[in-house]
């Protein structure tokens, strides 16, 4: 998944070679609200489920595993019941202008858990 699109890709192995086939592509932009930019986590989940259903239908239900590849600078916090505590902010949100997000995240996590 990237900042503007995501896709579900099937990896096929014939015993000697791995080939990749795109099964589903979807738009993946942010959602603006109150001068902030968020990820639409529920839409992303729905798109991924659609792609996995298409993959299962295309390959006779033979989906053996699932992996996710993403830029990975954003995060959502989960509560004790594994519920999402709030809408994840998009890394292109104005609060990140000129900042080194990875360093900020590490600093915040240290302060929360130490």
Where are these regions (language model features)?
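Short glycine-rich, Thr/Ser-proximal phosphate-binding strand/loop in the N-terminal lobe
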Residues: 1-42, 83-94
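Conserved active-site "lid/cap" helical segment
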Residues: 16, 33-64
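Glycine-rich phosphate-binding/catalytic subdomain of phosphoryl-transfer
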Residues: 53-114
């Amino acid at each position: 998944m990237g900042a503007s699109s995501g896709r579900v890709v099937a990896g096929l192995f014939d015993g000697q070679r791995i080939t990749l086939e795109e099964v589903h592509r979807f738009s993946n932009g942010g959602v603006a609200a109150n001068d902030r930019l968020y990820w639409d986590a529920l839409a992303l989940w729905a798109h991924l489920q659609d792609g996995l259903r298409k993959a299962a239908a295309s390959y006779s239900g033979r989906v053996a595993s699932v992996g996710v590849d993403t830029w990975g600078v954003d995060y959502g916090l989960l509560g004790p019941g594994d519920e999402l505590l709030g809408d994840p902010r998009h890394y292109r949100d104005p609060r990140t202008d000129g900042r080194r997000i990875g360093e900020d995240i590490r600093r915040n996590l240290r302060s929360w858990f130490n």
